[in-house]
Amino acid sequence: MLIKTEGFVLRNRKYGETDSMLVIFTKKVGKINAIAKGARRTKSALLAGVQPFSYSDFVLFKGRSLYTVNQTEPKEIFYNLREDVKRLSYAAYLLELVESVTEEGQTNNRLFNLLGRTLHLMKKEEIELETILRAFELKLMEYSGLKPHLTSCVSCGQTSSNSWRFSSKEGGLICHQCHGIDSFSIKINVLTVKLANYLLAKDMEEIQKLKVNPYLHESLNKVLKQYIMVHLDRVNFNSLEIAKKI
């Protein structure tokens, strides 16, 4: 059966001498594994459309356990990202996140569109990269059914507290009276909570130039790092570690 769909290449690895094994996040059939035969040959018609980050139109043949790329036409290669190692590393982190959170064969158009908009924004020199990354992380978790609860205590429902903490295990805020339910919870201030809620509520185009205090960035980053680690069951993202060293 032939399927026509657009998609983002999340991963491309060498398979044999001339083939590529791909992980593609498609709009029509979700995340899939696919083989692109002969794609590593320099004159292959498939070469440009199967590079990591490529946003391409695909004609796919669905086999018993694997898709085959019959045709592909790149729509966006994101050359600007490839010319800046830090932006490239952050963009690769987005792809790692998407691959980690999605199930094979399950579509998620909100996440698909979010990835496209974010990669396009990351091409711009004037954007606040850290702000965009935090917004993407929050929205990715929301669109995957893992939105953190940030409006009241997840245990008792209290909407005000002398001292808030964030529990990754419980999935959100815990007030000062409920701190004991999670010994690994992280202290979080009201401004960080407000920032997280703002990033969840606004679209990426509104967020792109938002300047945030470095302390708030670090505070939200600490919370989200633990939250993602717990819910995606993943400790490290290689591309993010590379970006931090640059």
Curated annotation (Swiss-Prot):
What UniProt keywords apply to this chain's record, in alphabetical order?
DNA damage, DNA recombination, DNA repair
Q: What does this protein do?
A: Involved in DNA repair and RecF pathway recombination.
Q: What biological process terms from GO does the record include?
A: DNA recombination; double-strand break repair
Output the Gene3D superfamilies linked to this UniProt entry. Answer: Nucleic acid-binding proteins, Recombination protein O, C-terminal domain
Q: Does the keyword Phosphoprotein apply?
A: no
The name this protein carries in UniProt is DNA repair protein RecO
The organism named in the record is Alkaliphilus metalliredigens (strain QYMF)
Q: Does the keyword Transferase apply?
A: no
Q: Which GO terms describe its cellular component?
A: bacterial nucleoid
Please state which protein family the record places this protein in.
Belongs to the RecO family.
